[in-house]
């Protein structure tokens, strides 16, 4: 996980501990096949978000029972519907979704690559226009990713090997914490050479 995402997550977790708020986060990793696909992202977010209250847990329990007590895998559409239901049910709380390192999701050839599915997922949830939903996406500035995210983004932070990087991270964290209007969505781009250890930008 990148240092900028770690900073944002820790700040938001502090808010979640002192008040009613929900956080879900996922990071892609080209070294781990379990962290390279949209199908791993959505169940992870569902589990995180549904663990905070009774109504959310009821949705998770229904998902389990509707698929023969876990014997059958739910379809992509069913998982997406379940996540949307959780987000809609949580309209009284701020919700923060952090998706880290989208560039490490494979962009393979085919009808729809794993990366394209993730980008479509982000677009679909931004289009929900939930006033309490805040989405932060981090990635290297690759063209296909920018083409999708740039039109959706209200706040961007570019991290390069230049002075002021620490301030950018702090600004992005504050932005995620304080913006409370519209379906806010932030994008953080990493510049320069990708480090092997994503904790050390």
Where are these regions (language model features)?
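Conserved NB-ARC/NACHT P-loop NTPase core of NLR-like innate immune receptors
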Residues: 1-201
